[in-house]
């Protein structure tokens, strides 16, 4: 199962999964990707749980 948490450090709209994943790694998550959240794209960090 995968758990997602919105990144606390990522600022602004998320257009690059690579940038999102890099920020997530600084938050101790192994990966991250952009997901649509209402009208904005946000960076969500993922880990196995």
Swiss-Prot record:
Family: Belongs to the DEFL family.
SMART domains cross-referenced by the UniProt entry: Knot1
PROSITE patterns found in the cross-reference section: GAMMA_THIONIN
InterPro entries recorded: Defensin_plant, Scorpion_toxin-like, Scorpion_toxin-like_sf
Cysteine disulfide links: 3-49, 14-34, 20-43, 24-45
SUPFAM superfamilies xrefs: Scorpion toxin-like (SSF57095)
GO biological process: defense response to fungus; killing of cells of another organism
Coiled-coil portions: none
Species annotation: Triticum monococcum
Keyword annotations of the record: Antimicrobial, Disulfide bond, Fungicide, Plant defense
Name under which the protein is recorded: Defensin Tm-AMP-D1.2
Function per UniProt: Plant defense peptide.
